[in-house]
Amino acid sequence: MRELTKKEIEILQRHAKWLKNEEGGERADLRGADLRGADLQDANLRDANIRGSNLRGANLRGAYLRGSDLQGAAGKILSFGSIGSRQEIAYVTKTEQIIHIRCGCFYGTLKEFTAKVEEEHGDSQYGKFYKAAIEFIKAHDAACWQDDAEE
């Protein structure tokens, strides 16, 4: 995992200020950035422009991506929705062969998400929606994220 450059850190710091409407804040513009292997764990990238960035191998564990422009970004990122009881967008990333999900207030692994859905919703209508999403994530993983050799 590579450390962020000084410039990348400054962009994220200005973005954090922008999110809080603080002086000196500016929306992150990381269009086309080479973020391969970057440690973006827990970064708040809400509404950031990441269009066309290379995120292969980046650590996105816990990263908040709601509203981010990910069009053309390369990496193991999936977003879809709205789903479930809160009609939230689900954000799915895969790092180090582990799938992570952020949906509403939930953040954890696919296994933890599956257990939480069963515990909270069982076979209710929302449980069925979430279980369909889980199957979609598994199918997407099998079809798109299994062959790391091509990256």
What are these regions (language model features)?
Residues 3-4, 101, 105, 125:
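A general boundary/transition motif marking the beginning of the first structured unit of a protein
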Residues 17, 26, 107, 111, ...:
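Intrinsically disordered, low-complexity regions enriched in Ser/Thr/Pro/Gly and simple repeats
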Residues 60, 65-110, 115:
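Glycine-rich hexapeptide-repeat left-handed beta-helix
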